[in-house]
Amino acid sequence: MLFKERNFMSSENRTSVPNSLNEHWMPFTSNKDFKANPRLITEAKGVYLKTHHGKTQIDASSRLFCNPLGHGRKEITEAVTKQLETLDYAQPFQQGFGGSFELASKIAKHTPGDLNKMFFTICGSTAVETAIKIAIAYHRAKGNAQRFRFVGRERGYHGMNIGCVSVGGMVNNVKTFASILMPGVQHIRHTHLPEHK
């Protein structure tokens, strides 16, 4: 059996639609349409998702690329549980955690050339925003403060922080936040154009 019956949030039946869909404001979703026809995922195993209707789907995007190793992997669950029981979080401001240094060393062994320094973040948006700031800080430290140019791609998505939206090319995001986006960003054409078909 692919999915076992289990309750993991509370004693409520997680296969039903919650009593209220008002409090959770969902990104990139027509909340009105969602309320009329909710699409809920109740469980995941490997590359499969289970809906509240009991249907199984393939998770082709790894939940926005956040679960590339698959869902519900026992060895990952055990390793995470062990770490949470030992130390659940250690902020890296002027204090270190040995595990993060070990992970950085392991990653560095697999990266090309001199790409051997790691800066850990909590999500893709924060990673992009941090990379933008590192690039700006690097050139300022080298005496090139005027060097401030970024290249993005039309229709590109890099996250929802202001820097991410600035280098991204999602039309509605750029229109909505145009007055507060970073200067010095140019966009190259998207590859999905009629002449490329």
Segments from the language model and where they lie:
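Conserved S/T- and glycine-rich ATP-binding loop of Class I adenylate-forming
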Residues: 1, 54, 150
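Short, Lys/Arg-enriched N-terminal segments with co-localized hydrophobic residues
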Residues: 1-8
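Active-site-adjacent loop/helix segments that line or gate small-molecule/cofactor pockets in enzymes
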Residues: 8-45, 95
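Electropositive phosphate-/nucleotide-binding environments in soluble metabolic enzymes
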Residues: 14, 39-43, 70, 74, ...
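Tryptophan-centric aromatic hotspots in well-structured domains and transmembrane helices
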Residues: 23-26, 65, 149, 157
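Glycine-rich loop-to-alpha-helix module at the N-terminal edge of alpha/beta enzyme cores
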Residues: 28, 56-144
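Active-site and channel-lining beta-strand-loop segments
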Residues: 38-59
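PLP-dependent aspartate aminotransferase-fold enzymes
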Residues: 105-197
